[in-house]
């Protein structure tokens, strides 16, 4: 499948996977790509498969010459589902923002090598954190 940008989806998937463990291939469809990060474990006592994490997820949508994104912070629960949550703990919030900022920078650099840009989606309502240094 070739996306509107003219790049084959298989090549984009391979390049996105090179960014690290963020890409969730099973949740990518057509011109939509899903990434997430389980940044902070809520409680290390439960068995690994029962742990919950604070983190973020970002969805990209391919367009002609750019990708648009929207992201959210929240809780990845025991069932493997994301729930948007306001992060109250300053240390956790800082960690989430730092990991998202780092991912965003590397994603933008990767897209630039393909002459594509990365911009917030028009319907993205969240207050943007400063993503570029």
UniProtKB/Swiss-Prot annotation:
It is found in: Cytoplasm. It comes from the Bacteria. Keywords: Activator, Cytoplasm, Transcription, Transcription regulation. Signal peptide: none annotated. The gene is crl. The keyword Transferase does not apply. Gene3D superfamilies: Sigma factor-binding protein Crl monomer. GO terms for biological process: positive regulation of DNA-templated transcription. This is Sigma factor-binding protein Crl. Binds to the sigma-S subunit of RNA polymerase, activating expression of sigma-S-regulated genes. Stimulates RNA polymerase holoenzyme formation and may bind to several other sigma factors, such as sigma-70 and sigma-32. Residues 99-122 are annotated as: Essential for activity. InterPro entries: Tscrpt_reg_Crl, Tscrpt_reg_Crl_sf. One of its GO terms (cellular component) is cytoplasm. The keyword Nucleus does not apply. Belongs to the Crl family.
